[in-house]
Amino acid sequence: MCIRDRYKKLPNNHDKVSLIEKLQLDIPDLYNSYNLKQRKSILEDLKNRLDYMDNYHEDKGNNNWQDWFKNKQWIFGSDVVQILDKRRTDYNNIYDYIIKSYDGFVDLIEIKDPKINFWAQSKDHNNYIPSVDLTKAITQCANYIHCLEKRINDKDIAVEIGNILKPRCTLVIGRSNNWTEEHFEAFRILNSMYHNINIITYDMLLKRAQKLCSIDSSET
């Protein structure tokens, strides 16, 4: 029986009010449950894509990585509240994603291929060092931040995308599913070198999002 028919069959106003009050309590719970189910399905899709990552490209072809992350801002964490449609703030640079953080300021997300080698093939003085491709990606992020900061007093840009103040960039690149403890130590040291760039692998992104969904599930 649909809600409308159920409402009509109620004998008195008191019962009708009780039904309305119950629905007002249940609808948010139903929405949260549905939303959580959708997110878990998306994370399962991400896991499958990583299992068959040779079938997908960074920014070319159908269903590439940059396209896949559109409209999935929640996967980058609770700090990200919106992925903006605008990707260009000048003639020279096209950003993967310009995002608005929870504090209203603008940050960046750069999506690279998970197939990229994170570490160089050989160590330097017995230390793991970034691969050439990772170094290039970090340099690109630093350049994007610099170019964005130059527009900090541009009122037109502020109207279009929001406030620019000490922008940060999240770089999603490579895999860490087969790392050793030594790799993770090197990763922590590498990330500590950059104040406005946060490097994260696809596996770390997936694991963090799964943990967020697990927390949400325990609260519903």
Task: Briefly describe each language-model feature range.
Residues 7-59:
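Interdomain/boundary linker segments immediately adjacent to catalytic/signaling cores
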